[in-house]
Amino acid sequence: MKAVIFVIDGLGDRPDEFGNTPLKEANTHTMDKIAKEGICGIMNAIDIGVRPGSDTAHLALLGYDPYETYTGRGPFEACGVGITVKPGDIAFRCNFSSVDKEFIVTDRRAGRIEDTSLLEKELDGLKIDDVEVIFKESGGYRAALLLRGPNLSDKISDADPKKEGKKVKEIIPLDDSKEAEKTANILNRLLKVAYEKLDGHPVNQKRRTNNLPVANMIIPRGVGKVPEIIPFDKKYGLKGACIAGTGLIKGIAKMVNLDVIEVKGATGTPDSNFMAKAKALVETLKTHDFVLINVKGADEAGHDGNYEVKKQVIEKIDEMLTYIMENIDRKDVYFVLTGDHSTPIEEMDHSADPLPIVIWGKSVRVDDVEKFDEFSTCKGGLNWIKGKNIMPILIDLMGLSKKYGA
């Protein structure tokens, strides 16, 4: 038997004045069919009342306790863009930004600069005292930064002022340790070096000539120490893979040793190539025991507060599922359909609202639920579960669980 966890990023919502959500209103023939043929429930990725990030939610869905394994977003971003991370490394997500001579931020995203590959080379490979700087752009104004060396700490503040017109924050230690003091000092020096190297760079000289915001500063945030995590294959004895369009989810997959399957046109946006992902899933099941697939467009629509686009994305995902269901057999595959968190239109951000979930496959206890949405699946046989329960349920269904007790 094989298993799939199909995650519709940002799936859940809150009812509007008419009691509808994008999922409830969408034409989801295949999702509803899966619900009718499976066992349904509702699920909080982390816990009841806890508003999940996509990173912590996916860790939980893979059976890892985020309270034990999550140190910050930085390590997963770094891993996702191809940096080889090691336990003890300190990692950050970064923006290329525009600042004046006083380090006042004039544009947090450097005019959404599209190509920073030449700027990356100015910073990658630097050494400050005994600390190596590993830096990689991750598309446009985004980048990842990793510090490698002895006696470093993640107990430091961010540099991000979060608003334009504010000065880049001095990084300070958050405890009294020498390690935190050293790390803050290294990072503050790095930001000064970055400004010196980037401000007069030919890329930025050309941008000034064209009256475009320069990318003359990096602003690190989301610090975390690279954690020690049991690889997925050792934890479960399954050869696993991940299909995702966003670097963060790819980073989580790489961190737990899932093979990342690259899909052309999979962008993580509402205009992503959804069907290419569906075909990739079917092909990947031929070579792997387990696949985590993340489809993100609904989340972006939720963050934008766009009800119609979120509904349309959900309908595109239903078309994906039609193809998938036509090409897998319930005798061979257990299929979990759910989300990682709700992104309500009214909030335009993640919320702690629970998500619909269904498990489809051989010998599941089919219940009376006939529609896949936030209001119907709560009547199903799974009742109310947490994300960390999904993998143990799958492992048991696959006949791989060990008995607890005599």
UniProtKB/Swiss-Prot annotation:
EC number(s) stated in the UniProt entry for this protein: 5.4.2.12
GO molecular function: metal ion binding; phosphoglycerate mutase activity
Pathway(s) this gene product operates in, as recorded in its UniProt entry: Carbohydrate degradation; glycolysis; pyruvate from D-glyceraldehyde 3-phosphate: step 3/5
InterPro entries, A to Z: Alkaline_phosphatase_core_sf, ApgAM_prokaryotes, Metalloenzyme, Pglycerate_mutase_ApgM
Enzyme's top EC category: isomerase
Annotated catalysed reactions: (2R)-2-phosphoglycerate = (2R)-3-phosphoglycerate
One Pfam family named in its UniProt record: PhosphMutase
CDD domains: iPGM_like
Record keywords, A-Z: Glycolysis, Isomerase
GO biological process: one example: glycolytic process
Chain's role: Catalyzes the interconversion of 2-phosphoglycerate and 3-phosphoglycerate.
Homology family: Belongs to the BPG-independent phosphoglycerate mutase family. A-PGAM subfamily.
NCBIfam families according to UniProt: apgM, PRK04024.1
Protein name per its UniProtKB record: 2,3-bisphosphoglycerate-independent phosphoglycerate mutase
Organism (species): Methanococcus vannielii (strain ATCC 35089 / DSM 1224 / JCM 13029 / OCM 148 / SB)
Lineage of origin: Archaea, Methanobacteriati, Methanobacteriota, Methanomada group, Methanococci
Gene: apgM
